[in-house]
A protein has these predicted regions:
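Conserved ATP/PPi-binding loop(s) of AMP-dependent carboxylate-activating enzymes
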Residues: 368, 379-414, 452
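Conserved AMP-binding A3 loop
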Residues: 55-60, 187-188, 195-219
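AMP-binding/adenylate-forming catalytic domain of the ANL superfamily
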Residues: 160, 510-534, 553-559
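Conserved pre-ATP/AMP-binding loop-to-beta segment of ANL
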Residues: 40-42, 159, 164-165, 175-199, ...
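AMP-binding/adenylate-forming catalytic core of the ANL superfamily
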Residues: 115, 125, 132-134, 280, ...
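Conserved AMP-binding/adenylate-forming core of the ANL superfamily
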Residues: 42-99, 116-121, 171, 175, ...
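Gly/Ser/Thr-rich phosphate-binding loop
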Residues: 174, 198, 256, 284-289, ...
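Conserved AMP-binding/adenylation subdomain of ANL enzymes
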Residues: 218-235, 242-285, 300
Length: 559
């Protein structure tokens, strides 16, 4: 495969960058096996939770292990089109089992290991999983979930690291399986065949099933080649649980280009010191982390570390506050390149290495897609006006854009209208074509006739030295309809008090329009988050609504 990432500026990238999608494509055979022909080419560097033990795998290793895994699955009856629920952490088995499923044409359903029994029950039932692959640490949850459902479609249960009643020992099956898998031995996959199913975060309703097709990895050439700026020699670390979509953002395009992945099998609470130590000493040249990770990293003594080998930093998942970008750049000498996309897409908007970065902006639309900001009548908005981020999808789905929400015609009808996919996210475009994120449509705060985006208020609050993390939502108010309320996690060394509340409120008033300041502030030990690390503003909104509407009616906020 040939890719052209040589653009020196944004306009050149718009002209030159294209993705060719063949009629037939199989990520396992067309990417992994072809890369395996390059002797000794590094694919994966894995380290354990403590950063003590490490293993390195070449593309040839991944090829042979995935062949064994595919043959083991074939022997158990797994075939093209079967849905395979995979709940494994950041372990090597995840990668070669994933590739094995792709070689067979099975449809994977990745799942985070932190799922509850109820979550697992919902996903196995709704997704009609034909097989489950997990490990000893998680199989009891699966057993409990399966007991609660009638699942005649579930034919196989595999344990990756041992045996248990009712479970097949997958490691043993692999030992007996051949490392040879001719392409002709399995059914051919078209680029349009089902590939994987992700479940959305489900912060306001039950998770939707997002279906991607077999060409999806090629779409991530935008993510890896343009936004991550990857070259074949690079080693990239994308901080992500294997069960959510940012893991795909750090795998498919990267391996297609031929870069290596650095994987830290992190467990438990995030360890900022260990992360910085691994980042600066284990060879990663490109780093991508969610905003939550960067917010926690800047609380450490960043000056203690040498960042010279890490040439490129990126962030996505939710907006990153400009203050965090500023602190990071001052301490490391490197700027963070923000990007934007969804479970349903590849990167859509980004700050790319071939253009200037505007802190606080998501960047510009990714070359190769037709992206615009539209109003509710599907007309392009003027500069500075807020609208919905939309992707042109009139003839067929662009490569990398999801096929549909499975079994959800209402959501499909709402998302795809007049030849556009509406992301549901709001933004505005400045005079240079840079997009600034405002929020989900239902995140917008309507106070006394003003429309306030939570992110702009959060960014100002984040500049206060007492604030480690914060979230802003609408709180019902009898006078104004809604008021701005901030939930704040304090930085180490600060104590909650009425005086601190007033200080933060005055701080915000001095730095933005007075009507945007948080009339109410509540301190929390931690913010509610989705499995992917995004702040659950919907949970905070609902809590406020129930508190003010459910007990004694509405009250008036601070005047």
């Amino acid at each position: 495969m040939a890719f052209d990432f040589s653009a020196k500026n944004y306009e050149e990238a718009l002209r030159k960058f294209t993705i060719t999608v063949p009629e037939h494509f199989n990520f396992g055979f067309d990417v992994i096996d072809r890369r395996a022909e390059e002797e000794g080419k590094r694919a994966l560097v894995w380290t354990d939770a403590g950063g003590v033990q490490s293993k390195e795998y070449t593309f040839r290793d991944i090829k042979l292990l995935s062949n064994q895994a595919a043959n083991a699955l074939r022997g158990a009856g797994v075939k093209k089109g079967d849905r395979v629920f995979i709940m494994l952490g950041r372990v090597p088995e995840w990668f070669f089992i994933l590739v094995a499923c792709h070689k067979l044409g099975a449809v994977i359903m990745p799942a985070p290991v932190i799922l509850t029994v109820g979550d697992i029950e919902y996903r196995i039932t709704k997704g009609r999983a034909n097989a489950v692959i997990t490990n000893n640490a998680n199989h009891a949850k699966v057993d409990e979930a399966v007991k609660k459902i009638d699942a005649p479609f579930l034919r196989n249960k595999f344990l990756s690291d041992g045996a248990a009643p009712g479970w097949a020992d997958f490691a043993r099956l692999m030992e007996k399986a051949s490392p040879d898998l001719p392409r002709t031995a399995v059914e051919r996959t078209r680029s349009s065949d089902p590939f994987l199913i992700y479940f959305t975060s489900g912060t306001t309703k039950y998770p939707k099933m997002v279906l991607h097709v077999c060409s999806y990895p090629l779409g991530h050439l935008r993510t890896a080649g343009l936004w991550h700026d990857l070259k074949e020699k690079d080693l990239i670390w994308v901080v992500s649980d294997t069960g959510w979509a940012k893991s795909a953002w750090g795998l498919y395009g990267q391996w297609t280009i031929g870069a290596g992945l650095f994987i830290h099998n992190a467990e438990g609470r995030f360890n900022a010191k260990l992360t910085l130590d691994l980042l600066t000493k284990r060879g990663a040249t490109v780093f991508c982390g969610p905003p939550t990770v960067y917010r926690m990293l800047i609380l450490e003594d960043l000056a203690k570390y040498d960042y010279s080998q890490v040439r490129h930093f990126t962030s996505a998942g939710e907006p990153l506050n400009p203050e965090v970008i500023k602190i990071w750049q001052e301490a490391t000498g490197k700027i963070i390149h923000e990007g934007y996309g969804q479970t349903e897409t590849t990167v859509l908007v980004g700050n790319y290495p071939f253009m200037a970065v505007k802190p606080g902006s998501m960047g510009r639309p990714v070359p190769g897609l037709d992206i615009d900001i539209l109003d509710e009548d599907h007309k392009s908005v003027h500069t500075g006006e807020v609208g919905f981020i939309c992707v042109k999808a009139d003839q067929k789905r662009p490569v990398g854009i999801f096929e549909e929400y499975l079994e959800n015609p209402e959501e499909n009808a709402a998302a795809f209208q007049h030849g556009w996919y509406n992301t549901g996210d709001k933004a505005y475009r400045d005079e240079d074509g840079y997009y600034t994120f405002i929020g989900r449509g239902d995140d917008i705060i309507k106070a006394s006739g003003y429309r306030i985006g939570p992110f702009e208020v959060e960014s100002v609050i984040q500049e206060h030295p007492a604030v480690a993390e914060n979230a802003v939502v609408a709180s019902p108010d009898i006078v104004r309809g809604e008021i701005v309320k901030a939930f704040i996690v304090l930085a180490p060394g600060f104590v909650a008090s009425d005086r601190l509340i007033s200080e933060i409120q005055d701080f915000v008033k001095e730095r933005t329009a007075p009507y945007k300041y948080p009339r109410e502030i509540e301190f929390m030990n931690e913010l509610p988050k989705t499995i992917s690390g995004k702040i659950k503003r919907a949970v905070l909104r609902t809590r406020e609504l129930e508190k003010k509407m459910g007990k004694g009616g509405l009250s008036a906020g601070k005047i």
